[in-house]
Regions:
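Class II aminoacyl-tRNA synthetase catalytic cores and aaRS-like
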Residues: 1-602
Length: 602
């Protein structure tokens, strides 16, 4: 028989009681975490979000209370009325904050029972992830997930408080808007009132936040849900949360200082004092030093060692003297076995654009002077692994774009190998331990990227990013050399956020659209409302968006975004708990004027 709560009021959370509460009358409510029956004594570990308190049911409580305690099982919801008592010294549990105290029950109410569990919500033995996602409400009872969701709350509050103190307005933007694809596919919402027409869920509030600057709000922010119908990847979510902001009249450094401030506040929630300002490097520097536009600073940068080799040496090694030649240093790896050297070649792969010399010690006999110079340039310690990557012989570049691509190809190959070696020898170098947070800004990204398949230029960030003033004259003559006033904030090789100074002049925005192959008619169809808005006194403005989910994942030391999102989708974009997506009724489809075409008919 289940009990009603009635007018009973909780006096304490389960994790609050301390030795100083001994003798107090208490009312606790929560879930039975564990039950131990010793006959005349029954122990219940009672749990809520704050922690666990041990409840003791003695013979003095009476037969009715004892019978109720005998009936309860794990995850039953109960209320306990009793008094706090100090534990005997030899029974103190030093592993929990309430370990000096226990509650002697005078009354026990069973507020709800619990079916046999599909799995035990424990951090020590995890059930299959699909089962846990189906029964997410049970999985969320795990202490680790509780800590992660609490951390998410604390991070969001810290960011909000900081931005509010800096004079930002939190302003909501629409979830039902028009489709303006920004790279990924939109999630479309059909209109019943206007058959055949659709709203789209926003991939970001990009245009709305720019319009807020046109409207004179000066400083905007929002912690906002965004939606992207992307191709499925292992750790992507179709809906995700951004920390979105925009500022009027900024320089890039204006945005940097704001972001550094709220990230410092966010990291303080786990007791980390971030050092600000973060270092900066250009996109070109990042590629040359790290072989990637998201540098991981925890390992040494790559070194340009081309000057270590004489021309005849390069010819002997069958590498291209005109292409980069870089050394990768991985600390504390020690002596490699032959098998490990072979594994480096396997990690590098069979590439046509670059080749690898898996350990410079193997070059010492044939090229001692070159190896000595490499050591001078790369500055390794005695136990460090040094690997050299060079450009393979290739046809002459057809133009400046091809030449840049070939050079960058070598850097990219070296950067990929550097990361692979960093992971392979992580236990030896120890740089990846949780808590080693290295942040930086990457600036001056290319404005455009060449699409070899489509034979046209695409926006590297998005088409509303402003080019550098000094590069305006290259928009038509050499688009690949145009730098954008774009910037990313990067942590340990992960992009936390991306932003830019925006285009605030209608004539420049039209030029960018033209460079992207957009006709005047297409510009009006897709962005006519925005091009018109730009003509009504638009101030210079810029901003950024950072992924809240990923920030919390990193702070929590979690392995997956699904560990920090209360109700995530699977890698196949399915919500197993509510079984979505699902078909809808023919009546609903008819109201919307939609006919579903089966896969076989596509």
């Amino acid at each position: 028989m289940l009990d009603f709560l009635g007018d009973l009021k909780r006096t304490h959370m389960c994790g609050e009681l301390r030795a100083s509460d001994a003798g107090a009358n208490v009312v606790l409510m929560g879930w039975v975490n564990k039950r131990r029956d010793l006959g005349n004594l029954i122990f219940l570990d009672l749990r809520d979000r704050s922690g666990i308190t041990q409840v003791v049911i003695t013979a003095d409580a009476g037969a009715e209370v004892h019978d109720r305690a005998t009936a309860v099982r794990s995850e039953f919801v109960v209320a306990v009325i009793g008094h706090a008592k100090l534990r005997e010294p030899n029974t103190v549990n030093k592993n929990i904050p309430t370990g000096e105290i226990e509650v002697i029950a005078d009354e026990l109410r069973i507020l709800n029972d619990c079916k046999p569990l599909p799995f035990t919500p424990s951090d020590t033995v995890l059930a299959n992830e699909e089962v846990r996602l189906k029964y997410r409400y049970i999985d969320l009872r795990r202490p680790e997930l509780h800590r992660n969701i609490e951390l998410r709350h604390q991070v969001a509050i810290a960011i909000r408080d900081h931005l509010n103190a800096q004079g930002f307005y939190e302003i909501e933007t629409p979830f039902m808007t028009r489709s303006t694809p920004e790279g990924a596919r939109d999630y479309l919402v059909p209109s019943r009132v206007y058959p055949g027409e659709f709203y789209a869920l926003p991939q970001s509030p990009q245009l709305f936040k720019q319009i807020l600057m046109i409207s004179g709000f000066d400083k905007y922010f929002q912690i906002v849900r965004c939606f992207r119908d992307e191709d499925l990847r292992a750790d992507r979510q179709p809906e995700f949360t951004q920390i979105d902001l925009e500022i009027s009249f900024p320089r890039p450094e204006t945005v940097f200082r704001v972001v550094e401030g709220f990230l410092k506040a966010a990291f303080s929630t786990i007791g980390v004092d971030l050092q600000t300002p973060f270092p900066q490097m250009s996109y070109d520097q990042a590629i040359r030093l790290y072989g990637i536009d998201k540098p991981d600073l925890r390992l040494p940068a790559m070194a340009d060692v081309r000057e270590a080799f004489a021309a005849e040496s390069l010819e002997t090694l069958h590498v291209d003297a005109e292409l980069p030649l870089v050394a990768i240093v991985i600390p504390k790896v020690g002596e490699l076995s032959r098998k490990e050297r072979d594994e480096i070649k396997t990690l590098f792969g069979d590439r046509k654009d670059a080749k690898v010399f898996e350990d410079i010690k193997r070059l010492e006999k044939s090229l001692p002077d070159a190896v000595a110079k490499i050591r001078e340039l790369a500055k390794p310690n005695a136990e460090d692994l040094v690997v050299v990557v060079a450009g393979a012989k290739r046809p002459e570049a057809a133009n400046a774009v091809k030449s840049r691509q070939q050079a960058y190809g070598v850097y990219f190959a070296a950067g990929q190998l550097r990361l692979a070696l960093g992971q392979k020898y992580a236990e030896r170098h120890g740089a990846y331990k949780h808590g080693n947070f290295r942040l930086l800004w990457v600036t001056d990204f290319p404005m455009f990227e060449w699409d070899e398949t489509e034979q046209r230029w695409n926006a590297a960030h998005h088409p509303f990013t402003s080019p550098h003033e000094q590069d305006m004259d290259k928009l038509e003559s050499d688009p690949g050399a145009v730098r954008a006033l774009a910037y990313d904030v990067v942590l340990n090789g992960t992009e936390l956020g991306s932003g830019s100074i925006r285009i605030h002049r209608q004539d420049i925005q039209a030029k960018i659209f033209k460079a992207l192959g957009m006709s005047p008619e297409e510009q009006q169809t897709r962005f006519g409302f925005f091009l018109e808005a730009l003509q009504y006194g638009t101030p210079p403005h810029g901003g950024i968006a950072l992924g809240l989910d990923r920030i919390v994942m990193i702070l929590a030391g979690a392995e997956s975004l699904r560990e920090v999102i209360p109700f995530p989708k699977t890698a196949k974009a399915v919500d197993l708990m509510v079984d979505a997506p699902t078909p809808v009724s023919e009546r609903q489809l008819k109201e919307l004027g939609i006919a579903v075409v089966g896969k076989k008919d596509l």
